């Protein structure tokens, strides 16, 4: 375990790195479908001329993502950071397989919504994990990194989609999500078990960061981008998917 006032142990850094990677991957899924929308519509029997009907495929994800932000902080305080992170990844993976198997718009949008619910749960739980692993005066950099990887994931989403579409069909995007989500969930659980990080808010400071809305820290600029995640003492502003 970490010595009070010092940085986290190497295994704790690994745990935080895995959580940040999960945040980036989920953020990428916001717009990973942009280049696949026409193929996805054809997969459920809609023509390219009905492209306007594809909007819920993107907005369904965003709705689930934003809906979870005010709720997960408190749940992470009560149930623990790692259980919430792994549960969020499992929900994300389930939404991915539901989307991959979809043959109508309702099922597809439902799957995307569940992906958003899982992805939205990762952000506050990861911020709370930072508060557990780092003393207050050393949180600016790790919190900034979490915000940065979220933004990077959102930007790289369409590129990831293009790479997958170059070698497979649109359903492969969501099968990849399924595999990565389950692998990250298992890796986070294993890393937490080896380090002994379980997590029900270790301090008042961690409760602050876990709470739904995260705010700009003194001296740390707020990040811009997708739906803002929040303001609260002790953490820099972060954001949801664009």
Give the ranges of each region predicted by the language model:
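Extracellular/periplasmic helix-loop-helix junction of adjacent transmembrane segments
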Residues: 36-67
């Amino acid at each position: 375990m970490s010595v009070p006032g010092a940085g986290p142990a190497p295994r704790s850094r690994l745990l935080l790195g895995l959580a940040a990677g999960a945040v980036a991957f989920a953020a990428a899924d916001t717009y990973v479908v942009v280049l696949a929308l026409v193929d996805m519509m054809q997969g459920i029997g809609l023509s390219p001329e009905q492209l306007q009907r594809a909007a819920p495929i993107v907005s369904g994800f965003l709705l689930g993502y934003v809906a979870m932000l005010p709720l997960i902080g408190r749940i992470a305080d009560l149930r623990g950071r790692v259980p919430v992170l792994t549960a969020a990844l499992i929900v994300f993976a389930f939404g991915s397989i539901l989307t991959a198997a979809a043959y109508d718009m309702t099922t597809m949008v439902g799957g995307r919504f569940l992906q958003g619910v899982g992805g939205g749960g990762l952000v506050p739980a990861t911020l709370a994990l930072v508060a557990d692993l780092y003393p207050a005066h050393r949180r600016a950099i790790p919190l900034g990194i979490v915000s940065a990887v979220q933004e990077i994931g959102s930007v790289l989403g369409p590129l990831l989609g293009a790479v997958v579409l170059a070698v497979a069909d649109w359903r492969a995007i969501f099968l990849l999500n399924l595999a990565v989500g389950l692998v990250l969930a298992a890796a986070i659980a294993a890393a937490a078990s080896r380090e002994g990080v379980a997590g029900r808010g270790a301090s008042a400071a961690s409760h602050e960061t876990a709470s739904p809305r995260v705010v700009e820290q003194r001296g740390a600029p707020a990040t811009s981008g997708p739906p803002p995640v929040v303001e609260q003492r002790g953490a820099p502003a972060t954001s949801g998917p664009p």
